[in-house]
């Protein structure tokens, strides 16, 4: 799930955290809403015999959703933290999973589509990762990517999650072009909730030793349901052609050129 600076520090997730994450992410409004957007952009890119690889697949939450919708696609996933992979394998037994560093991807011209979802922000050498993904894609292959957005949203939560950065749209688009991609589609999401997100991230700093990496998923059920409804409305706007300029996250689709 989360690579990069964690590879250097050993911080962030521990083995027991992945078990908790696997239990909670299915009910989280944020994970469910992100999955719906990923499905929406990925389905037109994946014919029945296509190959898809998720870089930083974590517990397999995204791949499992894609595989349910597109059972004939050949799925695989890579993950830096081997403790997460048993959960991914149990969710999608038909997929191939590899313990791997995103900065050193051994595949060459292997996949029709690569996805990486809230992974790149953890990696200091993000340009290296994009270049490795470019090599792993077939000619004219597609990359679907999500990242946290807006440096002004930086807070102790980013530090505790071992983020290296939050992106601007121009920064990510520029890095994709430098790596050899053309950008086909961008939109912000978690846009309607951005004011609430901003206010929630203002409290005083919390010591890293007190960090619970899955605490944000333990929302009051009523609050979680209300936020899920807002995200559903937002997704409808995006499907109708609205491209939000601001939002907690950024979704991009790019093509290998």
Protein language model annotation of sequence segments:
Residues 1-117, 128-130, 217-221, 237, ...:
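Conserved N-terminal segment of class I S-adenosyl-L-methionine
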Residues 196-228:
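C-terminal helical/coil "lid" or tail adjacent to the Rossmann-like core of SAM-dependent
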Residues 22-24, 143-165, 169-174:
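Short, glycine-/aromatic-enriched active-site segment of Class I SAM-dependent methyltransferases
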Residues 127-142:
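A short glycine-rich, Lys/Arg-flanked "PGG" loop and its adjoining helix->strand segment in the class I
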Residues 117-120, 146:
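Residues lining the SAM
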Residues 181-191:
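Conserved S-adenosyl-L-methionine
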Residues 200, 204, 245-257:
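Core SAM-dependent methyltransferase catalytic element
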């Amino acid at each position: 799930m989360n690579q990069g600076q964690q590879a250097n520090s050993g911080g962030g997730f521990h083995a027991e955290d992945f078990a908790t994450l696997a239990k909670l992410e299915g009910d989280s409004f944020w994970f469910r809403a992100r999955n719906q957007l990923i499905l929406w952009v990925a389905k037109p890119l994946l014919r029945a015999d296509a190959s898809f690889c998720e870089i930083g697949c974590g517990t397999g939450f995204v791949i499992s959703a894609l595989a349910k919708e597109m059972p004939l696609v050949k799925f695989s996933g890579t993950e830096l933290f081997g403790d997460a992979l048993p959960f991914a394998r149990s969710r999608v037994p038909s997929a191939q999973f590899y313990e791997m560093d995103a900065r050193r991807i051994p595949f060459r011209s292997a996949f029709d589509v690569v996805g990486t979802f809230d992974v790149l922000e953890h990696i200091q050498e993000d340009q290296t990762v994009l270049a490795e993904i470019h090599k792993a894609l077939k000619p004219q292959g597609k990359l679907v990517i999500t990242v946290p957005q807006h440096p002004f949203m930086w807070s102790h939560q980013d530090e505790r999650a071992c983020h290296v950065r939050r992106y601007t749209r121009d920064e990510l688009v520029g890095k994709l072009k430098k790596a050899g991609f053309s950008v086909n589609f961008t939109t912000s999401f978690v846009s309607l909730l951005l004011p609430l997100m901003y206010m929630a991230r203002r409290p005083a700093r919390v010591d890293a030793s007190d960090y619970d990496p899955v605490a944000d998923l333990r929302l009051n059920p009523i609050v979680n349901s209300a936020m899920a409804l807002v995200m559903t409305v937002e997704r409808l706007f995006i499907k109708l052609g609205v491209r939000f300029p601001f939002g907690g996250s950024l979704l991009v689709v790019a093509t290998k050129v």
